[in-house]
Amino acid sequence: MSEKKNLFRLALSKLAEVKTYWKTPPSGKYVPFKEIAAYSVGGAGVYFIYSLVGQITLNAGSMIVGASIGIDAIDLQTMNALSILLGFLIAPARAMMFDNTRSKMGKFRPYILYMGLPTAIFSTAFVYMPYETMDYSKKCITVFIFYTLLQFFSPFYQAAYAGLVQVLSPNSAERGWIIEISSIIYSFAPTVINPVLPLIGDLENIQTYRIAFPIFCLLGIFVSMFCVFGTQERIIVPKSYVQKVGFIEGLKKVSKNKYFWIVNSSNWLGFLAGGAGYIFQWIFYYGMNNSSLYALMVVIKGEASTPGMALAAPLMNKFGKKKICLFSLSAQVFCLIMMLTCYKNYILVFVFIFLKDMVGALSIIYLPAMNADMMDYQQYKTGDRLEGFIGQTGPLLTSAISLVTGYAIPLILKNFGLTNNYSDLYDGDFRNPIVKAMIVYSIIGTLLSLIPYLFYDLDETKRGSMIKALKVRALFEDRLRNEISEEALVDTMKDIIEAEEILKNETEHKKADIDAAKIILAEVSKFTDSSSGSRINLELLKEEYFAKVNAEA
């Protein structure tokens, strides 16, 4: 009974906390709960649309394009390669538009507002094309045209939502918490869509998608408006800062970001891991041949992500992003190895698929958190907020590499006799060798994708010191223009004085704290050393700081 009372009291205290900080953030934080709710609920709208667009893929796992419309797996990859080549023209423009956008709404929210509707319209129009009356070549042309249109609008839409969280707060821990909350809420969209589709009709039947797409797209447009009009972008820059970055200049600056290369090289090395995405559908949709039971299993499988997402932020805060990342990938390898021993046993293989998805869901939190830290490092390194260039250059390079690596899985499937004859997957003798091969290649791909993260060294102490260095930069540049605020003065000078105290007594502090203090004071020296012309009088700023603190006391 006492345990229930304690839980009840805890729930009441949390509700009281939400009420208290609904419009005003807690001390030391930047984002009120109202804004977190708007970002999270709006994200469900974005993902209603994005999850449907995700059904339209040019690979062997696409039930719409492969099984329903009937395009050969090799032809799908060839169309994908052509789309990638066109993307080389689109992605740079998208990057420049993101990073040079200057509007009252910020740099990301305008694209959520304006790119959602065309994404919804073209995806719905795609499934309503009369494929039943088309010959094979016309099907290929139609699919390619619509896919190319979607690849212009959809990445704007999804990247804008993903990028928005990176500028909601400069506090990494707070960002991680927002990502966790929003991920749990917006995952409601695919959690609903994936089991509903097989209940509407067969996944090989285009009529199923003609019912689902307009309903969920319309719902998505309306719900996504919450994050457009209910959030605010916050970045630490001087008041006079106006960013304008050219394409070549942006690429040069991004190339100096080592964490950009670490995160993206993991994607490049892990191309074989994509085979794991086919396993569940092939084993349970084709193997069990029961749409209702398959829909139930999709619901259960979808819930595997929830504990992973819920645990990710506290685990990251305790162990750091790198350790959680390595644990997630290693645990997935273990689950794949176990699946290799039991893929013919529906119960056991489902257990390991569930566990793999659960530990894999940690990446839903730690990858955006790593990406946000990567943006902060970029600003610290070059002085620019390059979310657009980083967000588009990575996928662009990945696409270029996939012009070659993308043929690996289709060629493997072709070697096993699978092209567009998806109905043969109902036969266990045909299906099981392919499933086994996909598991083996997924193990190899996941192991390769783990290697780059061994070199990731941007821990919380180092990242926090970079944020403080950015505050120093903003404070001093504002000081030179007589635009300094008292709040910024107190906050930043406190960090500088603490850093000085650490270096005066190095023997009493950890190496990480000493290195962090050096990063902060190195930024100070850029504005105060004789080599810089002594532009800033640090002692005078200290006098102003202590006068302000004493006055408040």
Please provide the spans of the model-predicted regions.
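Acidic, Ser/Thr-rich low-complexity segments on the non-lumenal side of membrane proteins
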Residues: I484-D515
